[in-house]
Regions:
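Hydrophobic beta-strand-centered segment that forms part of the acyl-chain substrate-binding groove
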Residues: 66-99, 104
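Non-catalytic linker/capping segments at the edges of enzyme domains
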Residues: 1-46, 155-158
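Short beta-strand micro-motifs enriched in acidic
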Residues: 32-33, 103-107
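Short coil/loop residues immediately preceding or within conserved phosphate-binding loops
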Residues: 15, 81-83, 113
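Residue-level recognition of well-ordered beta-strand positions that form the cores
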Residues: 41-43, 85-87, 101-103, 117, ...
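A conserved, well-ordered hydrophobic junction motif at loop->secondary-structure transitions
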Residues: 39-63
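HotDog/MaoC-like acyl-thioester-processing domains
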Residues: 1-7, 92-94, 105-158
Length: 158
């Protein structure tokens, strides 16, 4: 499935914030679907550090949200995040090669239950893990949002 034409040069779908630069600014590399698991290399740039050599928790959550959502596109379905829970197990280092893995735990109707871990590339022990619910995007999803925001800005909340 095409991601609305918003891919990097290699064909990887990109979010709205990254389309203009043609790469993932969070540091996520090419997503690969291998059986039931989506994997991607990721490296936290030191601009996202919280403490010395440690990634900010917001960066970690953003990477989970981004890659877990894009993993459904690899399976042919565009989704939106309904909920995301992150467990921070160990400090996530900056400027180190990491791997994120995403698994589909359950899928029924529009609901996709996903789990994910981030780990060092050379170590299987998770540094952080996430689980969440993604919903298949209905036609007109973003148009409805824009209409609602236009009404809000005009003082007509819906």
């Amino acid at each position: 499935m095409r991601a609305n034409g918003f891919e990097s040069a290699s064909g990887t779908p990109l979010c709205g914030g990254c389309r203009g630069v043609g790469r993932c600014r969070l540091g996520v590399g090419e997503l690969q679907l291998d059986g039931e698991v989506t994997q991607a290399p990721v490296r936290c740039n030191s601009v996202y550090h919280a403490g010395p050599g440690v990634a900010h928790g917001g960066w970690t959550a953003a990477v989970f949200d981004d890659v877990m959502g894009r993993s459904s596109i690899q399976r042919g379905t565009a989704t939106v995040t309904a909920s995301l829970k992150v467990d921070y197990l160990k400090p996530v280092p900056v400027d180190e090669l990491l791997v994120i893995e995403v698994r589909v735990e359950a899928q029924a109707g529009r609901r996709w239950e996903l789990s994910s871990i981030i780990r060092l590339a050379a170590d299987d022990a998770p540094l952080a893990r996430a689980e969440g619910l993604w919903l298949e995007r209905r036609k007109g999803h973003f148009e409805r949002h824009e209409e609602a925001m236009s009404a809000y800005r005009e003082g007509k909340p819906g």
